[in-house]
């Protein structure tokens, strides 16, 4: 069994981004990511801090806008509009979840597609579905693909199962795997018999937010397992959606949690931001 070490790969990517940023600075461009946080969700605050720290590590300027929980939708839209028209800002990220009185879809669509480094804008989703690399790809699925590529895992002809059908991970992940030549099944909350799919799979990607959802009796020998889940137990320990101890015994490759997909997600956010800055140069 080989661990898919996202922490090590993300560190390597950050070093490469440092060099790219030094080149851009020599041309008068400083990569800049604007992050908007609405409210005081503790998990969101932690994520925003980690993103700001990661930006600093590879020479990206980060602007954090921490807005009050009672910020109106129009006030948030006005800030995004200002950032859309600010040429010194190359990426805009709105930290989810948003308060209930704000429409998430409307907010995400208001970010200009050329600064949508999360890859959620309908235009960027369209590029992905057409198999084009013109736009930005969602960070978590992109991070998974880079991780698999780094370990020279050939996806062509693989039977792949994705557990979870969210717009953030499951759906774009399915499209990327399809574009890479895999045969893809997407399972979700209404799937009748999950094991029927997982037992036949060469590759399983789990993104459901459910502890121990994937157990060893549900997988075949030699399976490749990517665990996107992040769950905090009462003890404070962070675990994924996979029973790691048992499933790893049957896996050829598996991601740890933490240290697998999480660091890659942030690395891809940074990479998309630098890509946007480079587009400005071109």
Curated annotation (Swiss-Prot):
One molecular function GO term is:
methenyltetrahydrofolate cyclohydrolase activity
Q: What does the UniProt record say this protein does? A: Catalyzes the oxidation of 5,10-methylenetetrahydrofolate to 5,10-methenyltetrahydrofolate and then the hydrolysis of 5,10-methenyltetrahydrofolate to 10-formyltetrahydrofolate.
Q: Name one GO cellular component term.
A: cytosol
Quaternary structure, from the entry? Homodimer.
Q: Which gene encodes it?
A: folD
Give the organism, scientific name: Campylobacter jejuni subsp. jejuni serotype O:23/36 (strain 81-176)
Q: Which residues form a coiled coil?
A: none
Question: Could you say which residues bind NADP(+) here?
Answer: 164-166, 189, 230
What is the protein's given name? Bifunctional protein FolD
Its family remark reads: Belongs to the tetrahydrofolate dehydrogenase/cyclohydrolase family.
Q: Which PANTHER family does this entry report, sorted A to Z?
A: C-1-TETRAHYDROFOLATE SYNTHASE, CYTOPLASMIC (PTHR48099:SF5), C-1-TETRAHYDROFOLATE SYNTHASE, CYTOPLASMIC-RELATED (PTHR48099)
Q: Which reaction does it catalyse?
A: (6R)-5,10-methylene-5,6,7,8-tetrahydrofolate + NADP(+) = (6R)-5,10-methenyltetrahydrofolate + NADPH; (6R)-5,10-methenyltetrahydrofolate + H2O = (6R)-10-formyltetrahydrofolate + H(+)
* Entry EC number(s): 1.5.1.5, 3.5.4.9
Which pathway does it serve? One-carbon metabolism; tetrahydrofolate interconversion
GO biological process entries: L-histidine biosynthetic process; methionine biosynthetic process; purine nucleotide biosynthetic process; tetrahydrofolate interconversion
Give the range the annotation lists for the signal sequence. Answer: none
**Keywords linked to the UniProt accession:** Amino-acid biosynthesis, Histidine biosynthesis, Hydrolase, Methionine biosynthesis, Multifunctional enzyme, NADP, One-carbon metabolism, Oxidoreductase, Purine biosynthesis
Q: Which Gene3D superfamilies match?
A: Leucine Dehydrogenase, chain A, domain 1, NAD(P)-binding Rossmann-like Domain
């Amino acid at each position: 069994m080989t661990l898919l070490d996202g922490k090590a790969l993300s560190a390597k990517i950050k070093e490469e981004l440092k060099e790219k940023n030094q080149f851009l600075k020599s041309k008068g461009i400083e990569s800049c990511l604007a992050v908007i946080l609405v409210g005081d969700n503790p998990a969101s605050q932690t994520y925003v801090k980690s993103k700001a720290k990661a930006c600093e590590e590879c020479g990206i300027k980060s602007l954090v806008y921490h807005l009050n929980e009672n910020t109106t939708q129009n006030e948030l839209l006005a800030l995004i509009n200002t950032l859309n028209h600010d040429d010194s800002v190359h990426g805009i990220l709105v930290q989810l979840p948003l308060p209930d009185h704000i429409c998430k879809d409307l907010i995400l669509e208001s970010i200009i597609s050329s600064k949508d480094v999360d890859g959620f804008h309908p235009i960027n989703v369209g590029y992905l579905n057409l198999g084009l690399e013109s736009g930005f790809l969602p960070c978590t699925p992109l991070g998974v693909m880079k991780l698999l590529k780094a370990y020279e895992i050939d996806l062509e002809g693989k039977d792949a199962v994705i557990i979870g059908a969210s717009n953030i991970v499951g759906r774009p992940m399915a499209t990327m795997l399809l574009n890479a030549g895999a045969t893809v099944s997407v399972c979700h909350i209404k799937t009748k018999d999950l094991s029927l799919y997982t037992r036949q799979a060469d590759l399983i990607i789990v993104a459901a937010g459910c502890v121990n959802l994937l157990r060893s009796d549900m997988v075949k020998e030699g399976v490749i397992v990517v665990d996107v889940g992040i769950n905090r137990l009462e003890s404070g320990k962070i675990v994924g959606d996979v029973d790691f101890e048992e499933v790893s015994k049957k896996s050829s490759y598996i991601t740890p949690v933490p240290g697998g997909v999480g660091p890659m997600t942030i690395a891809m956010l940074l990479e998309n931001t630098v890509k946007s800055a480079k587009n400005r140069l071109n």
